[in-house]
Every structure is written in structure tokens, then in C-alpha cells.
């Protein structure tokens, strides 16, 4: 049976192979000197870890006490611990309120896996005995509603839809009212994929947020941005724009199993102080896992 840790290692293999092989080459029968430090710095930057974070890691790495002979596994252990420290703000639990409706706004650009992720989240919480509903606010694509319906059925959740091309904010409004009426525990609001620099679509998202707050000034309980791990450095722009509109509470990272750019998560967490609630490490409904910075850091360097 494949453990969660082994599945994570497999998912991060594209990034970890680069880092692990690079460290093996840099420290093969070599001393720890300025040349090797420079090579290590270049390797980490090439893995999409931000320059700011890499600089900090290298400075800390210089102060690690090593034996006279240093091997690559020892270096990997040290780097993993330093990366884990950089991710200290990432492991805030995804908490829900008891005895009230939790409104979870899900947003992101096109193709990051929002619908699939909502299906997996719905299944996760339905299995825990929660009453789950999903608002289909991507109203301009009939295919999106059909795809969402399939996932929601598998999760034994309630799907709340509007007419095709209906105002997404009106669907969100009705979904909240219906969820309150039916004593729903969690309402996931699925929004249309939108480019972060498309003003009209971002205004539409802003309108959804305003409508939510009309019904509950403390809502949404969570505003979550779905990030495709393949995105790389553009992750920073996406977080910045969506955060301005929705006041993000956290991130979910998808498609780790297909990315060679997973290192970007380290810098993103450090810059925006946002937790990573879940990570997607496969296509199956059970392949959405709670983020664990210790396991992630070790897997990232191939340990």
C-alpha cells in the first residue's frame, strides 16, 4: 500500500529530481566552500524558490555545523530543515465553525482544477458527516455546471444552480439562503475561472463577495485561491490580484504530480503569509491531502 508520504514523494519527483541530483553533483567529493555555496544557491533558484528565500536559506546553511567531510544526504537534510522553517506560516489548519453555515469561496484562473477540488472537498466533508452544498456560480458555461454536477453527485452533496448566463452573484445569494433553510454545514461557492488581470471578471468576483457580506458580514468563512503547481513564478501575481478582491485566507495547490516548479510555494507562503490548506497529489477523489510542511520539505529535496 502506498503511504501518503510516498505518494507525495512521487508527486514532487519532477522538482525533487532536479534538486536531489543537483546536490549530489555539487557535493560529490567536494568541500563546503564559496564555490559550492554559489552552485547550491543557483540550483535552488532554478527550482523556482524565490531569490529572497534562497538567500536566507544559504545564509542559515553557512551556520550549520558539519563534519569535515560533507556528503549530499547531509546537505539535503539540512536544506529540508531550512525549507521547513521557511514554511512555518503555511500549516494553519482549515477550521470550520460549528452550528452555523460555513461559506467557502473558491476562486482561481482557468484550468487550475477548481471544480475537481470542490468535488474532492465535498467528498471529504460529506464523509465526516457534514451537510455540504455547492453553488454553481460559473453560469456562462453549461459544461462547467455538468462537470460540477458529476462531482457533487459522487460526494453526496447538494448542488444549487441558476439559469445558464444568470448573474453569478444572484446564484450565490440564493445558494446561501437555501443552505440556511436546509441547515447546511458547508457551502462551497464555485466561481468561473478568470485571468487575474481581467477587470470585468474580477469585478464580477468582487460583486459575489459583496453579496455574501450582505447576508453575513463575517462571511465568507474562507476565501481560497486554487493554484496550479505548474504555474511557477506567475503564482505571485495571481495571489496578489485575487487577495485584493477577496481577502484570501489560504491556498490549495493542485497538480503537484505534474509540476517541476513546486519550489515556488516556499516563496509564495513567505511573501503573502498565507497557509496552504490542502495539496492535490493525484486525480482520484481521495488525492486531496492536508498540507504537511515537514513531509513537503523532505520530499522537495528527494529525502
Swiss-Prot record:
Gene3D superfamilies: P-loop containing nucleotide triphosphate hydrolases, Signal recognition particle SRP54, nucleotide-binding domain. Its main location: membrane. InterPro entries: AAA+_ATPase, P-loop_NTPase, Signal_recog_particl_SRP54_hlx, SR_rcpt_FtsY, SRP/SRP_N, SRP54_GTPase_dom, SRP54_N_sf. PROSITE patterns: SRP54 (PS00300). GTP binds at residues 108-115, 190-194, 254-257. One of its GO terms (biological process) is SRP-dependent cotranslational protein targeting to membrane. It comes from the Bacteria. CDD domains: FtsY. Disulfide bonds: none annotated. Pfam families: SRP54 (PF00448), SRP54_N (PF02881). Belongs to the GTP-binding SRP family. FtsY subfamily. Part of the signal recognition particle protein translocation system, which is composed of SRP and FtsY. SRP is a ribonucleoprotein composed of Ffh and a 4.5S RNA molecule. This is Signal recognition particle receptor FtsY. It comes from Rickettsia typhi (strain ATCC VR-144 / Wilmington). The lineage of its organism: Bacteria, Pseudomonadati, Pseudomonadota, Alphaproteobacteria, Rickettsiales. The gene is ftsY.
Amino acid at each position: 500500500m502506498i503511504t501518503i508520504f510516498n505518494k507525495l514523494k512521487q508527486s514532487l519527483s519532477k522538482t525533487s529530481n532536479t534538486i536531489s541530483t543537483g546536490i549530489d553533483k555539487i557535493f560529490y567529493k567536494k568541500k563546503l566552500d564559496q564555490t559550492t555555496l554559489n552552485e547550491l544557491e543557483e540550483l535552488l533558484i532554478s527550482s523556482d524558490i524565490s531569490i529572497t528565500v534562497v538567500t536566507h536559506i544559504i545564509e542559515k546553511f553557512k551556520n550549520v555545523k558539519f563534519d569535515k567531510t560533507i556528503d549530499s544526504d547531509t546537505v539535503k537534510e539540512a536544506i529540508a530543515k531550512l525549507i521547513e522553517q521557511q514554511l512555518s506560516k503555511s500549516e494553519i489548519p482549515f477550521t470550520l465553525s460549528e452550528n452555523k453555515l460555513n461559506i467557502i469561496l473558491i476562486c482561481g484562473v482557468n484550468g487550475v482544477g477548481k471544480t475537481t477540488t470542490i468535488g474532492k472537498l465535498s467528498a471529504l466533508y460529506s464523509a465526516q458527516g457534514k451537510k455540504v452544498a455547492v453553488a454553481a456560480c460559473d453560469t456562462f458555461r453549461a459544461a462547467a455546471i455538468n462537470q460540477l454536477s458529476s462531482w457533487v453527485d459522487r460526494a453526496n452533496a447538494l448542488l444549487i444552480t441558476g439559469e445558464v448566463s444568470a448573474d453569478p452573484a444572484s446564484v450565490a445569494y440564493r445558494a446561501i439562503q437555501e443552505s440556511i433553510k436546509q441547515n447546511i454545514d458547508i457551502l462551497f461557492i464555485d466561481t468561473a475561472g478568470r485571468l487575474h488581470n481581467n477587470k470585468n471578471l474580477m469585478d464580477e468576483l468582487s460583486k459575489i463577495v459583496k453579496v455574501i457580506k450582505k447576508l453575513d458580514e463575517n462571511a465568507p468563512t474562507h476565501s481560497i485561491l486554487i493554484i496550479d503547481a505548474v504555474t511557477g513564478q506567475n503564482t505571485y501575481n495571481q495571489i496578489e490580484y485575487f487577495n485584493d478582491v477577496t481577502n484570501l485566507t489560504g491556498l490549495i495547490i493542485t497538480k503537484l504530480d505534474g509540476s517541476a516548479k513546486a519550489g515556488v510555494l516556499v516563496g509564495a507562503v513567505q511573501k503573502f503569509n498565507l497557509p496552504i490548506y490542502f495539496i492535490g497529489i493525484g486525480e482520484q477523489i481521495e488525492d486531496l491531502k492536508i498540507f504537511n510542511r515537514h513531509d513537503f520539505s523532505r520530499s522537495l529535496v528527494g529525502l
